[in-house]
Design a protein with these regions (language model features):
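Canonical P-loop GTPase G-domain recognition
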Residues: 152-208
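Helix-rich effector regions associated with P-loop NTPase G domains
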Residues: 2, 24-29, 63-80, 86-107, ...
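Histidine-anchored nucleotide/phosphate-binding helix
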Residues: 127-142
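Conserved beta-strand/loop subsegment of P-loop NTPase cores
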Residues: 110-118, 138-150, 171-179
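Conserved ATPase-coupling elements of RecA-like P-loop NTPase cores
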Residues: 125-126, 155-161, 269-273
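Structural motif
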Residues: 115-117, 201, 259
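N-terminal accessory targeting/assembly segments
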Residues: 1-126
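A conserved segment at the C-terminal end of the G1
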Residues: 210-226
Length: 368
């Protein structure tokens, strides 16, 4: 297989000589490869010469550098089956770990298109779609919303045209595709969303049909699928790990492309790269809310948080209350995350409280 067919580009090629070899005395030299799957510290790596089941070198393990994730490009030594280095990512889909500790969980690396899958049954939730759109915007991947189970729209009494239009209004620049993994409706439109050798990932809740979509596109039952409870449209976690698949060439994409199936997400907690978004969590969020971004330009204060400030054009506008509340909720999440992860803000916060404590000590409360 050729590296270009796996997503290799000049962005990664330029990094080959941008850092010293961590093992300059090792022979043979490492070769570039892409992480196709990961399982308990072992990684399946695709290279031009074939597939390698590799571990991580001690140098990389102890360096504090990037840890390999599915979709990553790495430098691997075929003879030793060891990964020496992870190349910088072009895009990165992440969330905050669903636990109290503030940590990033990388869901997918080097994704060009993020297919946000929502079922048209009881899973349909515009507020959750908004969260996924923010996640995609932060990652650098292009979001495409897939409204699955379109074949059920009529039986559920839904106006499919109106639903597509309402999702499109969430972010006018995005592509929204009604599909049916069960009947193959509109699935042939997915390959045309990517260029040759590009990579997409399927993301959404459990039971929305991600694995079924993958199987239909592959023409093979490669991923297990589960039944969905009719009472609440909830599904079981049938996909438990991340894995890349090479998709067959088609009329829409003659060179083929790659698709990653992600486990269903019960929680969509946002993550913002501290270096990328330092000092501007609101600006990062506003990019996913076109209407709010346009209104924010007319706010009286440049650093308006769109909550209680006078002269706020956002809170004064006739916005959907649920949409505005969702924006404000995510804004608080990102601001809290930045305070916890930004060294600059942590230092400023400590200085602020030190000044307050010093002031209290210098001006003790007088007894009456």
């Amino acid at each position: 297989m050729f590296l270009q067919d796996l997503g290799w580009s000049g962005f990664f090629a330029a990094q080959l000589h941008s850092a010293p070899d961590p093992n300059p005395d090792s022979t043979p030299a490492g070769v570039p490869g892409r992480v196709a799957s990961a399982n308990h510290g072992r990684f399946l790596i695709w290279t031009e010469a074939g597939t390698i089941d590799a571990g991580v070198s001690g140098t990389l393990r102890n360096s504090g550098a990037l840890w390999p994730a599915v979709g990553d490009w790495v430098i691997v030594r075929p003879e030793d089956a060891v990964i020496d280095r992870v190349l910088n990512r072009q895009t990165c889909v992440s969330r905050k770990q669903p636990e109290r500790e503030i940590r990033e969980q990388v869901l997918a690396a080097n994704i060009d298109v993020l297919f946000i899958v929502s079922g048209l049954d009881r899973d349909y939730n515009p507020r959750r779609i908004e969260r996924f759109l923010v996640m995609a915007n932060e990652s650098g991947a292009r979001p495409v919303v897939l409204l699955n189970k379109a074949d059920l729209a009529e039986s559920l009494g839904l106006n499919l045209t109106e639903i597509v239009a309402s999702v499109q209004q969430l972010s006018p620049a995005i592509t929204v595709l009604p599909i049916s993994a069960k009947s193959d409706e509109n699935l042939d439109a997915l390959p045309s969303q990517l260029g040759p050798g590009q990579t997409a990932a399927l993301i959404g809740s459990s039971g929305v049909g991600k694995s079924t979509i993958l199987n239909r596109l592959l023409g093979d039952e490669r991923q297990a699928t589960g039944e969905v409870r009719a009472s609440d449209s909830r599904g079981r976690h049938t996909t438990t790990s991340r894995q890349l698949f090479r998709m067959p060439a088609s009329a829409a994409n003659q060179s083929g492309w790659l698709l990653m199936d992600l486990p269903g997400l019960r929680e969509v907690q946002l993550w913002a790269n501290p270096d990328k978004s330092a000092g501007q969590p609101t600006q990062t969020l506003e990019a996913s809310f076109d209407d709010i971004q346009a209104l924010a330009a007319s706010c009286r204060f440049r650093d308006c948080t769109h909550t209680a400030e006078p002269g706020c054009a956002v809170t004064s506008a006739n916005l959907d209350p649920a949409r505005l509340a969702n924006f404000q909720k995510m804004q608080k999440e990102l601001a809290h995350l930045e305070r916890k992860t930004s060294p600059r803000l942590a230092k400023e916060t400590r200085a602020k409280w030190n000044a307050i404590e010093k002031s209290v000590r210098s001006h003790p409360k007088r007894s009456s």
